Each structure stands twice: as structure tokens, then as C-alpha cells.
């Protein structure tokens, strides 16, 4: 297989990608773009994403965690292993490296590759004081609105309703958060709504999520003063019900 080498300068980071198949190049280059922009100096360094062909490693410890989508998680000393029937990924934050093994049958499965990259990337960012979470992120009157829930809970559907009501929806998939003492700074990966076109009523949400992925990514800052909902959890987080 042809090895595709990709190098990106993302803010304070150098990101290196090695992939075993040319078809992975587009998936990774497209997805990694959401990191573009200024990041904390403390997070500076090099992140390496290494993709290999072969049989995926399977987690086999009794303390495995399983997800509804068929992923298995296992934490070992200094690393996180996430495995699937056709691929696996291992995040090693201390080494700044994530390694993926993908079976030939899964090379063109962009959703599987994106999920593995998201999970391992989230682990590596977490160890640098950042959080990549599966959530919907919107802006309303200068405040950030974060919608969190398990897969299938209705985040995308709620996002559509929020957009139709005039809120500035940024993403219904992944949000990158940087917590500070007084605010949570958030940036979003904008992606197309997963609903069939005949189920999406004309409105702001469709146009927001359909815009080009390579545009400047939206940013929103949630300050303590802008959060006035009851049910305080821990500043600057509040629970909105």
C-alpha cells in the first residue's frame, strides 16, 4: 500500500499523519482542519497519527467499557485502547502519538475512521487541558449553549429546532472546549446535518451546516456573567433544564 504523509501546522501544534492508503488522506485532512486556529501555548507540541493496515487489536481485559455503537475501551498504563470489529486505535498522550490499525475492508469507511480519530484525539487533548466532546454547540445572545447527550438522544434534532428558532448553531457533532477560571472557550467542527434532505424544513440550520468546511471556524466564549440559568453546577458551568 502507498503511504501518504501529511503535515499540518495548527496554531501551536505540528500534526503529522501517516496513512496506509491514499483514500484515507482526504478523510484525515478534512477532519483535522477543525483544530486550526490559536490554541493554548501549554498545548504546543507535535501530535502524530499513524495508520497501519492489518488485523485490529482487540481489548480483552475484564474492565473493558463498551459503547452502544460497538466500540470497546480499555485503559492501560499511559494509553487508551479503543477497538472495533474492523479497526482499532491506541492513544498515548505522553508520547504525543496515536496509532491506528485498519483492516482492508474498512479503509473506505470514513465514519469508522472519523470516530476512531475523534475518540483518540479527545484523549490526547484531555491530557493537554482541552476537551473534545460529542455535543451540539450553539450561540445565543453572546452566550454559548452546549447540548450533551448519548448517541441517539436527539442532539441533532434539538439543534435543528434551535436553529429554526433563530439560534446560531455551530455544530451538532463535536466541540472543542478550553475551560479557564472565568470562561469556557469553545470551537466547533461544522458538519452537514445527518437528516435526509426531505426531513429538513427550510431554515437557518440547513444553511449553517451546509457551508464550506474550510471557512474560518466560528468561536464562542461563555462567560460567567452570561450564564443566568438556575441550577448552578460549578462556575462557569450551569445546568439548563
Annotate the PLM regions.
Residues 158-159:
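Post-Walker A alpha-helix
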Residues 168:
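Residue-level detector of anion-binding/catalytic polar loops
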Residues 155:
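Conserved lysine of the Walker
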Residues 172:
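Active-site flanking residues adjacent to catalytic metal/cofactor-binding acidic residues
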Residues 1-151, 164-165, 175-241:
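A noncatalytic interaction/capping subdomain that flanks phosphate/NTP-handling catalytic cores
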